[in-house]
Amino acid sequence: MIGKSVPRVDAYDKVTGRAKFTDDLVPANCLVAKIYHAKIGNGIVKSIDTSKAEALDGVVKVVTFKDVPNHCYPTPGHPWSVELAHQDVADRNILTGRVRYYGDDIAAVVAEDEITAQRALHLIEVEYEEYPVEIHPRKSMYGSKPPIHLDKKDNVLVRSNYFIGNVEEGLKESETVIKRSYKTPIVQHCHIENPISCAYMENGRIIVVNSTQIPHIVRRVIGQALGIPWGKIRVIKPYIGGGFGNKQDVLYEPLNAFLTTQVGGRPVKLDITREETFCNTRTRHSIEYDLTAGVDSEGHLLAKDMLAISNQGAYASHGHAIAANGLTAWRLQYACPNIKGEAYTVYTNTPVGGAMRGYGIPQVCFAIECFMDDIAKEIGMDPLEFRKKNLIKGYYEDAYLKPIAANTNGIFECLEKGADYIHWEEKRKEYTNQTGNIRRGVGMSLFSYKTGVWPISLEIAGARMTLNQDGSVGLMLGATEIGQGADTVFSQMTAEVLNMDISDIHIQTVQDTDVTPFDTGAYASRQSFVTGTVVKDCANLLKEKILAYAKELLPEETRKLRLDHGWIMAGKDPAISLGNLALESYYSLGNSSVITAEVSEQVKKNTIATGCCFAEVEVDIKLGKIKILHIINVHDSGKLINPKLAEMQVQGGMSMGMGYGLSEQLILDEKTGRPLNGTLLDYKLMTMMDTPDIKADFVELDDPIGPFGNKALGEPPAIPGAPAIRNAVLHATGVAFNENPLTPQRLIDGFMKAGLI
């Protein structure tokens, strides 16, 4: 079953509309909540008058920041830590009177219907005392009066650094020293389903049905926000319309949970708009990089120095980890004896930066891979050859986090496949020294990516399996299907171990913190690796129990038993069907024992996935237009559990990477920090008309510590596209663009400065 492109187990329900998402489960009599957002970018609420809103017919309750529990809580979807030093930053309140960005949450209305709730918002009167707004981290990191958060006087959330060797000496010994600066934009996840939840009370407990990647973590954070025992909360996650990391944060679930307690436990739906999703949930961080490198006369890297300054926005979210995670890429993959990495994550009066597909690696990869091309150009070397000269060959460990290692390293095979597809050598020569308005170029980039979060953070997962009366197997996990095909992969893993047809594996796609085993959720490309390890162990345990029970039923001479597609086989002969054995286990008067298996494990391992992107582009210099002619991603993600799903995963990530490179950016007003293009009309996502044919290929090297030889694939496809496109434009035009996306405005400005227009 492993390695087969079986159809998705949830495909039929989704394409026929039978799949139930959060909004499908909202009861008909549900109240509706809407949030009043601040209309300034920085300041305090001096007064708030809700009397007119409360008097409106149909309004059930109005709450303000004065009414909510005064508990600061963390929002990122990380496992909790019993060690204070490893706990996430708790800087958020359910509602606030201290406005830190345009759109901050001040009050909420609960009404009988959505129209009434919206009308009530317009009747709330607020008076502010405004403070200066700062949206640029390089300015904000020198402090503001007052600081954005009182405990961070310089507005620096966290500073990270490491040193390997002696960078200063390495630079002195270098033949050539190159310095460059790069900047990446704020972008938004743009998942199909906006964050939505429905909360109600039952038997004195709060039940929250919501669209999340992290149901067990949502439960804990609601408890922290409300100051109540976590066992008083139940979180249910049905089908989810995408997340890409935005729903790896606890968003408005604590507010919704609080609101139901204020209306007698009646159901309350909190469904935010697309505009609110852009401004009030999470974004990918904008990060600025200053890079320095020294190379010897043969092009070997002798020293590397990175300074990263990350725009965190108004609250901490995942910010303490994003830029630091990016720093790890600076020391991986390329051999260099002297390395320095330093990162500052800075509060600003902007929408909050959080987790997004790649978790800081798309930003740092853009900087590193653009820099590698710029170095190669400076020293007159082919960019591919320069990379090959400096890449680490074979097995290697992270110098700082040695449990993290490239146990298999297929990067050279990936590069060979990508270069062959794009005809690298021929086109590098063909497109040299072009003139005219229309020019072509080829570019490439590569990446490395960890699988999961161990040893930086906890990795734990749980699985439960039951042999049903008909001989099929029920599978229940705390890990979440968020559209990526996880349920199909877990079903394949179970079927592989039990030697069953996948149609006989019935996976429960709904996570319920009262019922499903504990798992931290969908993030860090961890599930097929971490949860997959537990699924394999649980299936093996179930198999042992099935065969042990079979031995009790069968004659002594039939001792060597095995499972084979619904049968217990004694050698080559069928001994008893799994269905009949299951009936015996449930209903035998003399030997009834329902066969179940449950495993919860801490998974202490990590492995590095790698890959590359090659792109060929055509540039219209006068129009500032880029047309992608050919593009390919090649991934070493170990053994592919489901090749078709893997290909689809890569294609989706490549589309996201192309948007990151060409069109996507959240533009903020300089004076207020308010998003100026926070709609799907103005925020330029890649469409079908913009997307070229996308090629995905793989190098399948079985990873020795992956449960089935597999490793990360969920996030890596989104990483290398943007720098590959930028480097292709560099080859085509000779102009180096050090900030993405490469919009027509940015291209024309660069071409004018270079004298091409």
What is each residue range found by the language model?
Residues 239, 243-270, 486-493:
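Thiamine diphosphate
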Residues 4, 10-13, 82-86, 154-197, ...:
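Glycine-rich loop/linker segments at domain edges
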Residues 72-77, 120-123, 219-221, 244-250, ...:
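Short acidic, glycine/serine/threonine-rich loops at helix termini
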Residues 1-154, 177-180, 264:
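Flexible, low-hydrophobicity surface segments
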Residues 65-66, 227-232, 261-268, 297, ...:
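C-terminal catalytic domains of large/alpha subunits in multi-subunit enzymes
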Residues 97-98, 229-231, 236-237, 262-273, ...:
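Conserved catalytic cysteine-centered active-site region
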Residues 144-226, 390-472, 599, 676-688, ...:
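Helix-loop-helix junctions that connect adjacent transmembrane helices in secondary transporters/permeases
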